[in-house]
Amino acid sequence: MKRLSLFIIAAMILAELTAASQDASFKNKVITKTDLEKAGTSIPASAIGDPVSSVKLYVPRWVEATDATPAYAVVEGSIFPVDPNGWPINFRVLLPASWSHRAMQIGGGGMNGSITVREGKNPMINKGFVMYGSDSGHQGGMGGGGTVLASGPSGAKPDDWALNEEAIRNLGYMQMKKTHDAAMVIIERIYNERPRFNYYVGGSQGGREGLMVAQRYPADYDGIISDVPIVSLSTLMLAPELIRIQEKPLSSWVTPDKTNAIRA
């Protein structure tokens, strides 16, 4: 079934690419290092569809072409919460020197916590796609995603974000919209237009995110790929405990009474 789904997706994208190639106005748009000055240092909070206090953009970078990857720009930023005791959403946008008028938002994995889009060899950058993604609004998750741009309250413990309502809402759905809207502003500034086609792609946690944007923000995307989605957020939150229980021998079994005592 998975192979069939991927085949259907590939066929749909190929059909779209073929149709676009026959449109003379669909010629790739080219940028250079000098275009980075158009990125700016901030984005108005009013440009973001869900509530934020501010959006900071860091100094953009230009990555020269290699044998494996064409030249591209890197724009990173932090979306700050309304709650002064909340956690920021750190995000990254990769903008190819030769843009195919397409963009792709990449979903997370596990409990997130690191920016999903990374620099380096990427087949979609080679095809002229803008790539963008975030750490979902808390820091220190699995997989790593480069240097942390901004973090939560001073002295906070690694999992304290889960006790913050805005951070939980960000994980659940708002970070996808906030990251999307910030990326669209950056794309328009750099290329002077927004994508003609925009996609969301994710698996596991990212697959759940894909289902969520399909429900809440369908107008933002021309296509959504949701692979093996974790549809139960409660199960995802319990996953570390369940794994530990399954990996331990019977003598280490934590009974319900012990669990309640630990959590008391």
Q: Locations of the language-model features?
A:
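Bacterial N-terminal signal peptides that target proteins for export
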Residues: 1-7, 228
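Bacterial N-terminal signal peptides
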Residues: 5-16
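Catalytic-loop region of hydrolases
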Residues: 21-102, 115-118, 263
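Glycine-rich His-Gly loop
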Residues: 108-110, 229
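Cap/lid segment of the alpha/beta-hydrolase catalytic domain
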Residues: 110-192, 238
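Alpha/beta-hydrolase fold nucleophile elbow
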Residues: 193-204
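Short glycine-enriched nucleophile-adjacent loop
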Residues: 207-218
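A catalytic-pocket lid/entrance helix-loop region that shapes and gates access to the active site
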Residues: 213, 221-264
